[in-house]
Amino acid sequence: MRRRPLLLTPHFVAAYFIAGCGGVSPSTAWQAQCPQGSYAPQSLDEWFRTSAEVTQGRHGPKVEGYIYNNYFAGAEQMLIGIEQLSPSGHAVACTTVWVIGSVPQGNRAYFVAPAPDASAKYRVRILSFNWMKRGGQ
C-alpha cells in the first residue's frame, strides 16, 4: 500500500505547534552546556551553514534563524544547540531545539527558541541529524 505524502496545511501546522512538536516547546530549558555533537565540526561546516539573530517576539526575546544545507542529500530530525555566549565568547548556557521539518538539499529550514537575554550573543551548533534517503523517502 502506497503512503500518501504529508501535506503541510494550515490546520496541520497549527496542530503541530499546539502539540508542542515544533521548533519551540513551551518548556524550552536552558542548561549549563550543550551535549556533545554526533559529527565532526569540520564536516558540519562543509555540509551546513547557520544564520541566527535575536528578535523580539510576542512573549519576549527569541533566537531565530535558518540552517542552510549545502550537501547533495537532505537532512531530517535535526537537533541543534543554541548557546548563549559571555562577552568573551564562551558558552554560558545552552538549549536544544528541533529544526522544523527537514532541511532539503540546496535549501534551508527555520528554527526558533526563546532567548533568556535579548542583549546577549548566541551561537548555533548542529548536534545531530539523519541523512534522508535519495528521492526523499
Where are these regions (language model features)?
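C-terminal motif of bacterial Sec signal peptides marking the signal peptidase cleavage site
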Residues: 18-20
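Asparagine-centered strand-capping/turn motif at beta-strand->loop junctions
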Residues: 67-71
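A short beta-turn/strand-edge loop motif at beta-sheet boundaries
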Residues: 72-77
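Beta-strand signatures of extracellular beta-sandwich domains
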Residues: 79-83
